[in-house]
Every structure is written in C-alpha cells, then in structure tokens.
C-alpha cells in the first residue's frame, strides 16, 4: 500500500484552501463558505514531503461549521491525532476535495483512464462519507493516521 501524495490529490481535482498551524489558520483565513462545504479535507506538511499527513471529512451540518469544527477539535486536543497536529509546531497545507470528485481515490483507484470512465460514481443515497473514508484507508496510508 502506498502513501497518498499531493499528486494523487491534484489528479483528483483537489484545491488548496489555506495553511494551518496548531489548529489555527496561518497566513490568512478562508471564507466561511469555503470552510462549510461538505467533503474531504487533507493536510500536507512540508516535513512529510509530498505525502498526505491526515484526512478529515465533513458532512452537511445545520450549523455550517464544517472544517472549522475540525480545527476546534484540534485546538482542544480531543484525540491523539489532534494533539499531534496541535503540538508539533508544523504548518499544514489544507486541500479540499468534494465527494463528487472522490472516484479516482476510491472506487476508481489504480485503474487506467479507460477503466476509470466505466467505474461507478458515488451517487447512492446510502453512500456515506464514512464509507468513502474507509475506502481511502483501504487504498492509501497516511503519515499521521493508522486507519
């Protein structure tokens, strides 16, 4: 199994939304509309080279907190991963990828362009972000996450 890289994210169509350090925005805060989008957020540290350090997903929320809630959990050090990110004094570039663009990283992972075109999309009403998250864990390793 290989580590997910920035190249994998770029090939899937991910966009950089900013940089965090210690659970706070570093060098400017993105607009709330960007942070409240449902989908996947990936953290990449220069220290880890082009490998993705961690991943988080955000669903639809009435409060529209989105990735801001993830940052709050990091600042509060609510898990081992959050404590590591909060305490290691490293800057992380944050990439955003909507669920609609996850096919190359989940069901289409490792397939050529032709096979990818015929691979199913995630459109089932029962498809969950949790299921996509597990597919990512099946296909890739992440520097700071074991699963």
UniProtKB/Swiss-Prot annotation:
GO BP term, example: symbiont-mediated perturbation of host cell cycle progression
UniProt keyword terms in alphabetical order: DNA-binding, Host-virus interaction, Inhibition of host DNA replication by virus, Modulation of host cell cycle by virus
A GO molecular-function annotation: DNA binding
Coiled-coil boundaries: none
This protein's record includes keyword DNA-binding: yes
Biological role stated in the UniProt entry: Disorganizes the host nucleoid and inhibits replication, but without host DNA cleavage or degradation. Only the architecture of the nucleoid is affected. May act on the host chromosomal sequences that determine the structure of the nucleoid. Binds to dsDNA but not to ssDNA.
Protein name: Nucleoid disruption protein
Primary gene name: ndd
């Amino acid at each position: 199994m290989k580590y997910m890289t920035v190249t994998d994210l770029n090939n899937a169509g991910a966009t950089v939304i900013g940089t965090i350090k210690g659970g706070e925005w570093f060098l400017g805060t993105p607009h709330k509309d960007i942070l409240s989008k449902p989908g996947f957020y990936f953290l990449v540290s220069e220290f880890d080279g082009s490998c993705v350090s961690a991943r988080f997903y955000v669903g639809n929320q009435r409060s529209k907190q989105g990735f801001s809630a993830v940052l709050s959990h990091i600042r509060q050090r609510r898990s081992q991963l959050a404590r590591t990110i909060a305490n290691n004094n490293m800057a992380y570039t944050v990439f955003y990828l909507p669920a609609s663009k996850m096919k190359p990283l989940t069901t289409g992972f490792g397939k050529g362009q032709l096979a990818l075109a015929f691979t199913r999309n995630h459109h089932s009403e029962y498809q969950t972000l949790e299921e996509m998250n597990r597919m990512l864990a099946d296909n890739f390793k992440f520097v700071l996450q074991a699963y």
